[in-house]
Amino acid sequence: MTRSKSTTETTRAARQARIVAILSSAQVRSQSELAALLADEGIEVTQATLSRDLEELGAVKLRGADGGVGVYMVPEDGSPVRGVSGGTARLSRLLSELLVSADASANLAVLRTPPGAADYLASAIDRAALPYVVGTIAGDDTVFVAARDPMTGAELADTLEKLT
C-alpha cells in the first residue's frame, strides 16, 4: 500500500530548511509564532516537533541590545562563509540587534552584547572578512576584536558602530 503525502506533510530536512530560512529573515519571538509562519507556508507542525527541530538546528533565543523580548537565531552553519558576499549585510543586522556598547584599548575594540550573544556576533565579524580585522575572541557577553595595523582599536570600534 502506497501512502501519498498531503501538502501539509514535509520531510524533516525540508521543514528544518524552512525554519532556518524563516529565522534568518524574520524576528521570531516564540515557537507559536514560528508554527504560524510555517502553517502560512502549508507546513503543519506540533509544538513537540518544532521544539525538537529547533534543538537539532542549534537555535537559541537571544535578547537584543534593547533588552526586550528575545528572538530565535540559528548558528552560522548555513550562512555565508568567510569572505563571501552577504556576510557584511548579516554583520550589520547582528550589530544593530546585539551591540550594547563599544570601547577600545590599543588595537582592540571591545564590544558588549546581551548575555549569550557574543559568539554569534564574533562569528559574524569573522565571516564578514573585513580587511581591517585580524580576528575575534568571544566570551559570554564580550567580544575582543583585533584591528589590523595601522588601524587603532578606537577607529575599529567606531567603524563597527557605524555598520549598525
Swiss-Prot record:
<comment type="pathway">
    <text>Amino-acid biosynthesis; L-arginine biosynthesis [regulation].</text>
</comment>
<dbReference type="GO" id="GO:0003700">
    <property type="term" value="F:DNA-binding transcription factor activity"/>
</dbReference>
<dbReference type="GO" id="GO:0005737">
    <property type="term" value="C:cytoplasm"/>
</dbReference>
<dbReference type="GO" id="GO:0051259">
    <property type="term" value="P:protein complex oligomerization"/>
</dbReference>
<dbReference type="InterPro" id="IPR001669">
    <property type="entry name" value="Arg_repress"/>
</dbReference>
<comment type="similarity">
    <text>Belongs to the ArgR family.</text>
</comment>
<dbReference type="Pfam" id="PF02863">
    <property type="entry name" value="Arg_repressor_C"/>
</dbReference>
<dbReference type="GO" id="GO:0003677">
    <property type="term" value="F:DNA binding"/>
</dbReference>
<dbReference type="GO" id="GO:0006526">
    <property type="term" value="P:L-arginine biosynthetic process"/>
</dbReference>
<dbReference type="InterPro" id="IPR020899">
    <property type="entry name" value="Arg_repress_C"/>
</dbReference>
<protein>
    <recommendedName>
        <fullName>Arginine repressor</fullName>
    </recommendedName>
</protein>
<keyword id="KW-0028">Amino-acid biosynthesis</keyword>
<keyword id="KW-0804">Transcription</keyword>
<dbReference type="GO" id="GO:1900079">
    <property type="term" value="P:regulation of arginine biosynthetic process"/>
</dbReference>
<dbReference type="GO" id="GO:0034618">
    <property type="term" value="F:arginine binding"/>
</dbReference>
<comment type="function">
    <text>Regulates arginine biosynthesis genes.</text>
</comment>
<keyword id="KW-0805">Transcription regulation</keyword>
<keyword id="KW-0678">Repressor</keyword>
<dbReference type="InterPro" id="IPR036251">
    <property type="entry name" value="Arg_repress_C_sf"/>
</dbReference>
<keyword id="KW-0238">DNA-binding</keyword>
<dbReference type="InterPro" id="IPR020900">
    <property type="entry name" value="Arg_repress_DNA-bd"/>
</dbReference>
<keyword id="KW-0055">Arginine biosynthesis</keyword>
<dbReference type="InterPro" id="IPR036388">
    <property type="entry name" value="WH-like_DNA-bd_sf"/>
</dbReference>
<keyword id="KW-0963">Cytoplasm</keyword>
<dbReference type="Pfam" id="PF01316">
    <property type="entry name" value="Arg_repressor"/>
</dbReference>
<dbReference type="InterPro" id="IPR036390">
    <property type="entry name" value="WH_DNA-bd_sf"/>
</dbReference>
